[in-house]
Amino acid sequence: MPESKYRQQTIRAPRGTVLTAKSWLTEAPLRMLMNNLDPDVAENPHELVVYGGIGRAARNWECYDAIVDALTRLEADETLLIQSGKPVGVFKTHDNAPRVLIANSNLVPHWATWEHFNELDAKGLAMYGQMTAGSWIYIGSQGIVQGTYETFVEAGRQHYNGTLAGRWALTAGLGGMGGAQPLAATLAGACSLTIECQQSRIDFRLRTRYVDEQAATLDDALARITRYTREGKAVSVALCANAADILPELVNRGVRPDLVTDQTSAHDPLHGYLPSGWCWEEYQKNAQSDPRGTMQAAKRSMAAHVRAMLAFSKMGVPTFDYGNNIRQMAKEMGVENAFDFPGFVPAYIRPLFCRGIGPFRWVALSGDPQDIYKTDAKVKEIVAEDKHLHHWLDMARERIHFQGLPARICWVGLEWRQKLGLAFNEMVRCGEVSAPIVIGRDHLDSGSVASPNRETEAMRDGSDAVSDWPLLNALLNTASGATWVSLHHGGGVGMGFSQHAGMVIVCDGTDEAAARIRRVLHNDPATGVMRHADAGYDLAVECAVEQGLNLPMVAATQGKG
């Protein structure tokens, strides 16, 4: 690894109201960049890795320093351009333009492979931004907890008469994304057994209360699961082992979980999935000396992993891919029926996307947890009738450990995002919270991603691979005045399999911010309703009509009906 990708330095975002940059609109991206690299947030901050294999916040440390310098100097009518983690230009725009525009990991489709990307990365010409790593809005595992919780809850509704009490989920992976699974299962009322091959990750999840217990052996783990499910307790258990070994063993023993999924970093076979029989140090060494052989070894293990998942599915166990592209990797290794079990979006989440409901998140730039608790109360006040959401907020306050700057996520839709943003802006204006708040989201949202093996799998009209939609989302958020906008490739499922966009907007208490919030927090989720209405989903068409969206072709179709 080039020296510029490693630095023994601890980075934490400033707290309070003293500015390092010239305004809150440039202070916000500066703090959020730094927050992504906080050791309480990032998986490997010394190498700029935030989460998801090699998802970085900046291309190298020289680029990081240059980004920080540019943001501290940026004027109110200038825009900083970031190309794969490198600051490449500052241009005069206008006050309501984004302060930062980011493009990460984008490759011409024919060359959009891990092999070509890794060559560029080795030359210092590219950076893998994942989704929220390179777009500076990662908030730790909380960022995916509610989405995973909603998935488990819906699985309980569909398969177990609305409750997961006395049930258990089998999964793997305790990294930045997978680490949400055990807590989400617990919050949904289920026990869980999560396989993780790195003890350090288990230790972190135990320390932050995302995992309740660690078992010493597989027999110990199964004994715990049996005891807790019999007692109706929702307890999460971790086991340090390789999923490619454990899942086939469970199949051979005839063990029958109640849900099976996976959230290892299978999207990146070179850095994110330990081959069976290897130790982590051997994996890292071989990734440098023999990348092709290492990737093949990882994918062979993924094939064994997926064959076991298929066996569980054949037993009648609800089994689903949680968006890491492990089915694709297995299919490339000869598992022709790898896609016989579905992804989580078509199985459980798409009805939410049809109404523009997705991962709305916000961060208190003050660093004061009380600011988040006050906004929690405001959400309950505004979305007064949604008791399911209230329950989520109560559980989140009780169980979720803040990582870095205090943050919250809750899944809300087109009807509410603008209202909540305006309310937060008013709280800043009136001094109810001590500093501005940033509002963003995961790129995993209803209108901001094209990913045929994940968010857009099995679209009704067959438009799974059409990536015009995230491009339009990024363009519209730019035109609407988001504070920073990002357009990435390869997040979640790896090179060649996704394109996606993100946005963040600052609530600084000004009238100008309120005007931008009205545009951005309406238009952004509205693109999701538009995308699903265009694909023929009745729920989305109904939502578009209810919210008064101007969708010419949908209106024409409705008129013909």
Curated annotation (Swiss-Prot):
It catalyses: 4-imidazolone-5-propanoate = trans-urocanate + H2O. It comes from the Bacteria. GO terms for biological process: L-histidine catabolic process to glutamate and formamide; L-histidine catabolic process to glutamate and formate. One of its GO terms (cellular component) is cytoplasm. Binds 1 NAD(+) per subunit. Disulfide bonds: none annotated. Its EC number is 4.2.1.49. Its cofactor is NAD(+). The active site is at 410. NAD(+) binds at residues 52-53, 130, 176-178, 196, 201, 242-243, 263-267, 273-274, 322, 492. Pathway: Amino-acid degradation; L-histidine degradation into L-glutamate; N-formimidoyl-L-glutamate from L-histidine: step 2/3. The keyword NAD applies. The keyword Lyase applies. Keywords: Cytoplasm, Histidine metabolism, Lyase, NAD. One of its GO terms (molecular function) is urocanate hydratase activity. Pfam families: Urocanase, Urocanase_C, Urocanase_N. Catalyzes the conversion of urocanate to 4-imidazolone-5-propionate. PANTHER family: UROCANATE HYDRATASE. Belongs to the urocanase family. This is Urocanate hydratase.
